[in-house]
From Swiss-Prot:
It holds the Pfam family GidB. It catalyses: guanosine(527) in 16S rRNA + S-adenosyl-L-methionine = N(7)-methylguanosine(527) in 16S rRNA + S-adenosyl-L-homocysteine. It is an enzyme of class 2 (transferase). Keywords: Cytoplasm, Methyltransferase, rRNA processing, S-adenosyl-L-methionine, Transferase. Gene3D superfamilies: Vaccinia Virus protein VP39 (3.40.50.150). One of its GO terms (molecular function) is rRNA (guanine-N7-)-methyltransferase activity. The lineage of its organism: Bacteria, Pseudomonadati, Pseudomonadota, Gammaproteobacteria, Pasteurellales. Belongs to the methyltransferase superfamily. RNA methyltransferase RsmG family. Its EC number is 2.1.1.170. Specifically methylates the N7 position of guanine in position 527 of 16S rRNA. S-adenosyl-L-methionine binds at residues 73, 78, 124-125, 139. Its main location: cytoplasm. It is found in: Cytoplasm. This is Ribosomal RNA small subunit methyltransferase G.
Length: 203
């Protein structure tokens, strides 16, 4: 698995330490183990997890501005855990409303010895953070409007929303509240992943 991950990282031009590579492999092994009992993801093959979960999360990293982020509807910690592993100086809150997902994340934090991740079991609309965030991340929302409607109280005044999407649908922008504007639409290149991936940055 290590050779495969090293190859994928090279193709994506992502440079990380050997320790971080090992943490990412350990994360996939943990996810695979827990998945058999708790059904955390529909992706069953660890090699496929490297592409669809790890690399798909990591390619967002160069575009993150700031130090404090929340991953809303994180599921089994995606993209939050991979991003936290390769950005140890940034802080990540991982929020989900399902207990088994947060239990997995707590276990992963312990096993991987991550000091920059805080798991939160809550519905997003009920979560009131003491401090707002530089960035609100999510792979979970069906539309940009849903994301901004549900998470409007989370970013700082100059913070950003980062929506990880498949195909970029321009009609989603027309549905947005007029107070939000699209800052960037970035076409992401994920090695060995079939299909389009986009990062939409708005505030």
């Amino acid at each position: 698995m290590k050779a495969k991950l090293v190859s994928l990282l090279a193709q994506a031009n992502i440079k990380i330490s050997d320790q971080q590579i090992q943490q990412l492999i350990n994360l996939v092994n943990l996810l695979n183990k827990w998945n058999k009992a708790y059904n955390l993801t529909s992706v069953r093959d660890p090699q496929e997890m490297l592409v669809k979960h790890i690399l798909d999360s990591l390619v967002v990293s160069p575009y993150l501005q700031g130090d404090r982020f929340i991953d809303v509807g994180t599921g089994p910690g995606l993209p939050g855990l991979p991003l936290a592993i390769i950005n140890p100086s940034k802080q990540f809150v991982l929020l989900d409303s399902l207990g088994k997902r947060i239990s997995f994340i707590r276990n992963a934090i312990r096993e991987l010895r991550l000091t920059n991740v805080t798991p939160v079991l809550s519905r997003v609309e009920e979560y009131q953070p003491e401090d707002k965030f530089d960035g609100v991340l999510s792979r979970a929302f069906a539309s940009l409007k849903d994301m901004t409607d549900w998470c409007h109280h989370l970013p700082k005044e100059n913070g950003y929303f980062y929506a990880l999407k498949g195909i970029y649908q321009e009609d989603e922008i027309n549905e947005l509240n007029k107070k939000y504007t699209i800052q960037k639409v970035i076409e992401l290149s994920v090695p060995e992943l079939i299909g389009e991936r986009h990062l939409i940055v708005l505030r």
